[in-house]
From Swiss-Prot:
Catalytic activity line of the entry: S-ubiquitinyl-[E2 ubiquitin-conjugating enzyme]-L-cysteine + [acceptor protein]-L-lysine = [E2 ubiquitin-conjugating enzyme]-L-cysteine + N(6)-ubiquitinyl-[acceptor protein]-L-lysine
Species of origin: Arabidopsis thaliana (Mouse-ear cress)
UniProt xrefs under SMART domains: RING, WD40
Protein name: E3 ubiquitin-protein ligase COP1
GO cellular component, one term: nuclear body
Gene that this polypeptide is encoded by: COP1
Span of zinc fingers (RING-type): 52-90
Length: 675
């Protein structure tokens, strides 16, 4: 099959052909001065004998022909420029045989005047009467002036009252809006005061725990009989204090710093005092640097963090009364509201990392013989192996620990499986560790056994390029695929034909099973929408999520209820599939044409960019947490700046800050989030 393009470009909806022809009679000739431009009378209202046979309007400037017919002067003159005959009887006619018809002209003017007088408003009739010189006495004029003055005063009064009412309505509306805003701000301030008090109390508890810990260390140090018990006691005390620090949020760093000082004091009897203090100062300086860096990250994303905090605190107030009572008991027992605890978790995870660090790299020149796009990169069930596929027509399986721990020249695939066509997507079976599915540019979906390096099943029902395939987590024998033929097909590994076929009427770019149920799938398509289906009833989707402005290239589930999507409109979006609501839009990367990858875990989203960078977002914050730019020693600055390469695939390691990334040059990097 002939390959049209090498780059995996996201499909776009082709516009329907539209006709915009205009009929010849659409722009009809409107009579100029020779027509009825001076008359306001419609033809149906008057005798047809008064109409010009040429323009079919009231005759204006009537002229009589030698044969006895009357026309508008401009109409008959225009006609005689083209033909020398009468439009009515076809008798020979020239300009010299035209004569003014004064009587008819006067009659037509009177008829027009009578018609106007019948249809005119009383005001127009009164004005017409005055213009004609109607006799009116001075007394009648005075009465009319008085009447008009009173009418004017009344109209001005009504206009002023209306204006005042409009202004008053606006001010009332503005006041209500500002009062609502004030109430909201006051409520938010109350939340903040309560949380400040809770955090201050918790900080005092931490300081007291630190002091108790220091006292106990000194007591143990002064008692020779208990010195041998230090390690056990320290571990036990440290465990308790650490359990407190989990709830301490931003004060964990300070507490750990003080704790280290306490340890140094308890174990420095045999050391010079200066050395003990210098070690403490060094660690204190390091903690201070980390604290400053985290504060900078907070201020850089302050607006998003503020919105996140207020949203979580307000959600608590909107809960039913019974739930609020339970929450109040939680506050009394632990000192934190649920909203504050949730936000502290967000703040902690958001400020924990500031960069992506490369821990391993597989350069395309080391393994691949030519530059090639890695369209998909995926971890297996246990995160021990990962597979790559792309335009090289080959599935390569690597051992993750070997890639990370062994030298670069030893990083070779442990399995290679050749295919007939370029590959677009991979999906490991979530139960059968050695099974992996692929989709390719010919529309074939294949299930492979990586142990035997043989295909187990081949599904060839798709008529065009298949972009996506996914195994169900809950039903290991089921998988779903989507294609440019606008079809979504559900397959079972126990039979050759598709189980379910959905015609979407638009190119399918991505499909994904809900991790909690094999009954639900999300489908992203070139129609800019995400269609969420219950496979038990495919007559129509459960919901269609709208918001993207271009094709949806990826869909991924963070949880059973949270769905992330990527689009070539350079945005990621987060959706709630339980309540069918949009949650958040993420911006910062560039994606206008290509498949650049999307991967998610419980807290973070990561995607590629057409600037050859990897971007990481926290799910609660709309701007990137960090990014990493790919580079290669074989690529000069001019080539890199030209934007010829882009990130093509990304994949998180389960419950880990480690991520696999690949670009269109074929370079694979293992990145890890770092402070």
């Amino acid at each position: 099959m002939e390959e049209i393009s090498t780059d995996p470009v996201v499909p776009a909806v082709k516009p329907d052909p539209r006709t915009s022809s205009v009929g010849e009679g659409a722009n009809r000739h409107e009579n100029d001065d020779g027509g009825s431009g001076g008359s306001e009378i419609g033809a149906p209202d008057l005798d047809k004998d008064l109409l010009c046979p040429i323009c079919m309007q009231i005759i204006k400037d009537a002229f009589l022909t030698a044969c006895g017919h009357s026309f508008c002067y401009m109409c008959i003159i225009t006609h005689l420029r083209n033909k020398s005959d009468c439009p009515c009887c076809s008798q020979h006619l020239t300009n010299n045989q035209l004569y003014p018809n004064f009587l008819l002209d006067k009659l037509l003017k009177k008829t027009s005047a009578r018609h106007v007088s019948k249809t005119a408003s009383p005001l127009d009739q009164f004005r017409e009467a005055l213009q004609r010189g109607c006799d009116v006495s001075i007394k009648e004029v005075d009465n009319l002036l008085t009447l008009l003055a009173e009418r004017k005063r009344k109209m001005e009064q009504e206009e002023a009252e209306r204006n005042m009412q409009i202004l008053l309505d606006f001010l009332h509306c503005l006041r209500k809006q500002k009062v609502d805003e004030l109430n909201e701000v006051q409520t938010d301030l109350q939340y903040i005061k309560e949380d400040i008090n809770a955090v201050e109390r918790h900080r005092i508890d931490l300081y007291r725990a630190r002091d108790r810990y220091s006292v106990k260390l000194r007591m143990l140090g002064d008692d020779p009989s208990t010195r041998n018990a230090w390690p056990h006691e320290k571990n036990q005390i440290g465990f308790n204090s650490n359990s407190l620090s989990i709830r301490g949020g931003n004060f964990v760093g300070n507490y750990q710093n003080k704790k280290v000082e306490g340890k140094a004091q308890g174990s420095s009897h045999g050391l010079p005092k200066k050395d003990a203090l210098s070690g403490s100062d060094s660690q204190s300086l390091n903690q201070s640097t980390v604290s400053m860096a985290r504060k900078k990250r907070i201020h850089a994303q302050f607006n998003d963090l503020q919105e996140c905090y207020l949203q979580k605190r307000r959600q608590l107030a909107d809960q039913p009364n019974s739930k609020q009572e339970n929450d109040k008991s939680v506050v009394r027992r632990e000192g934190y509201s649920n909203g504050l605890a949730d936000f502290q978790s967000v703040l902690t995870t958001f400020t924990r990392y500031s960069r992506l660090r490369v821990i391993a790299e597989i350069r395309h020149g080391d393994i691949f013989h030519s530059a090639n796009i890695v369209s998909s990169i995926e971890f297996d069930r246990d995160d021990e192996l990962f597979a790559t596929a792309g335009v090289s027509r080959c599935i390569k399986v690597f051992d993750f620990s070997s890639v990370v721990n062994e030298p670069a020249d030893m990083q070779c695939p442990i399995v290679e499986m050749s295919t007939r066509s370029k590959l677009s997507c991979l999906s490991w079976n979530k139960h059968e560790k050695n099974h992996i599915a692929s989709s390719d540019y010919e529309g074939i979906v294949t299930v492979w056994d990586v142990t035997t390096r043989q295909s187990l099943m081949e599904y060839e029902e798709h008529e065009k390029r298949a972009w996506s395939v996914d195994f169900s987590r809950t039903e290991p024998s089921m998988l779903v695929s989507g294609s440019d033929d606008c079809k979504v097909k559900v397959w079972c590994t126990r039979q050759e034909a598709s189980v379910i076929n959905i015609d979407m009427k638009a190119n399918i770019c991505c499909v994904k099973y809900n991790p909690g149920s094999s009954n639900y799938i999300a489908v992203g398509s070139a129609d800019h929408h995400i269609h969420y289906y219950d496979l038990r009833n495919i007559s129509q989707p459960l919901h269609v999520f709208s918001g993207h402005k271009k094709a949806v290239s990826y869909v991924k589930f963070l949880s059973n209820n949270e769905l992330a999507s990527a689009s070539t409109d350079s945005t990621l979006r987060l959706w709630d599939v339980k309540d069918n609501l949009p949650v958040r839009t993420f911006r910062g990367h560039t994606n206008e044409k290509n498949f650049v990858g999307l991967t998610v875990n419980s807290e973070y989203l990561a995607c590629g960019s057409e600037t050859n960078e990897v971007y990481v977002y926290h799910k609660e914050i709309t701007r990137p947490v960090t990014s990493h730019r790919f580079g290669s020693p074989d690529m000069d600055d001019a080539e890199e700046e030209a934007g010829s390469y882009f990130i093509s695939a990304v994949c998180w390691k389960s419950d880990s800050p480690t991520m696999l990334t690949a670009n269109s040059q074929g370079t694979i990097k293992v990145l890890v989030l770092a402070a």
